[in-house]
Design a protein with these regions (language model features):
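Gly/Ser-rich "nucleophile elbow"/oxyanion-hole loop immediately N-terminal to the catalytic nucleophile
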Residues: 139-144, 190-226, 240
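Bacterial N-terminal signal peptides that target proteins for export
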Residues: 3-18
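A domain-start/cap signature at the N-terminus of enzymes
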Residues: 34-146
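Short substrate-entry loop that stabilizes the transition state in hydrolases
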Residues: 141-191
């Protein structure tokens, strides 16, 4: 059918083509003697691909929104016993390519208490005059790799909100950890953490942070307050395959903007004041709670018999927009990402006009529709089953003042093509 999906599954002998989505999905090589030559070949492929993406996406918003998938004809037959060795080789090649790429690098983390500032220039094609200042710092010390928290601030004056983020980041009891605390580049209509220029920043952050080697790839967390609550709820769903857990606070998105099914396999905390009526935040948080509870009842366990929708969504009694912020990150830190889930639920939707090119170990080679597509994958006894459906939303509740679509019905039809 037209809706083609590429998956990876373990078998004794197999051929896998090197592919690149946001990070890495590749395994190659079968002989130790040829290892260095193959690693150089793979590194050069990665580097050229990164340069192509950089050239295309920084010059054209359309190119960034298309999110082109790159492939290669590099192939080698490998045996099961050599998989780990070749995974390391490919990862090393990926890291080398990223270090050689000419781009603004992520600052070296210092003690977060110092408040050392750095910044990235985001592509002009995605947002004019967009400079993203950030703090990138470490809390405490520990042997090995650290969890990374991405904190998104609220929509007050951006300098003040950013400074508050640094104070909160140092205060929260989640160390040892790393913190990335960005400042919104532009206010007004661009004061949204989910727009394409910011997507560029998040993908760059994840890519560069993992390459540096001091971040635990399975302990990435996103959370935020108010506007940052809206943003982190959207990013939780859109990038769920990268997070261990997510924690919006004092927000509330219509669920068309953040489908809950995508948050299967991660921890999800959502805290809002019970009396936070602005933009219907308390009502939309309640609708999110109902949706997660319903998803949990419908699919309580994944294919490995593990809980699929672990969530904590509470309306805090007697509180309005200001709530207890310290409750979120200690809860999030308990979660470790499962990089190879055997149950994947994914509603593929656009965020600011841009779709993902893949999700976990699924890669979309061609989509059956330009609209939304829902993928339900289960792996059992090395058999992969994928159901693909087209999704249609119908609004069943709108607010009378702003016309916000509050609730929806969804209908599903089998994908064709």
């Amino acid at each position: 059918m037209k809706g083609q999906i590429q998956t990876m599954k373990p078998i004794k002998n197999f051929i896998v083509a090197v592919g690149l989505t946001l990070a890495l999905s590749a395994i190659t090589n079968n002989a130790h003697a040829q290892g260095s030559n193959m690693q150089e070949k793979v590194k050069n492929y990665f580097l050229q691909t990164l340069k192509k993406k950089q050239n295309e996406e920084q010059k054209s918003k359309d190119a960034f929104q298309r999110n082109k998938t790159y492939t290669t004809d590099i192939q080698q037959l490998i045996k099961n016993k050599d998989i780990a060795q070749n995974q390391k080789m490919v990862w090393d090649a990926w890291c080398e390519a990223n270090r050689e790429l000419n781009e603004q690098k992520l600052a070296k983390p210092e003690d977060l208490r110092k408040g050392v500032k750095a910044s990235w220039n985001l592509p002009e094609a995605l947002e004019k005059n967009a400079v993203m200042p950030y703090y990138y710092g470490v809390k405490g010390s520990a042997a090995g790799k650290l969890p990374l928290f991405l904190y998104l601030h609220g929509s007050g004056p951006k300098e003040q909100e950013w400074a508050t983020g640094l104070i909160l980041g140092n205060r929260f009891q989640d160390g040892p950890s790393l913190y990335f605390i960005p400042q919104i580049p532009n206010e007004g209509d661009y004061y949204r953490w989910w727009q394409v220029a910011k997507q560029f920043a998040w993908e760059k952050l994840i890519r560069q942070a993992l390459v540096e080697g001091n971040v635990d790839a399975n302990r990435l967390y996103v959370f935020g307050i108010s506007e940052g609550g809206y943003g982190s709820q959207r990013l939780a769903s859109f990038y769920a395959d990268y997070w261990a857990a997510a924690g919006p606070m004092a927000g509330g998105e219509p669920l068309k903007n953040a489908p809950v099914e995508n948050c299967a396999n991660i921890g999800f905390s959502f805290l809002t004041g019970a009396d936070d009526t602005g933009f219907y935040r308390n009502i939309l948080t309640y609708y999110t709670q109902i949706a997660f509870d319903s998803a949990q009842l419908a699919r309580p366990l994944d294919a490995d018999k593990r809980p699929l929708f672990v969530h904590r969504i509470n309306l805090l009694p007697g509180m309005q927009h200001h709530i207890k912020y310290d409750l979120t990150t200690p809860w999030l830190k308990n979660f470790v990402r499962n990089p190879y889930p055997k149950t994947v639920l994914w509603e593929d939707y656009d965020m600011d006009g841009r779709h993902r090119s893949g999700f976990y170990n699924l890669q979309v080679l061609s989509s059956p529709t330009q609209n939304r597509t829902y993928y339900d994958m289960n792996i059992h006894n090395n058999v992969v089953k994928i159901n693909i459906k087209e999704v249609e939303y119908t609004a069943v509740e709108r607010d009378k003042h702003w016309g916000i679509e509050m609730r929806f019905n969804r209908s599903y039809t089998n994908a064709k093509g």
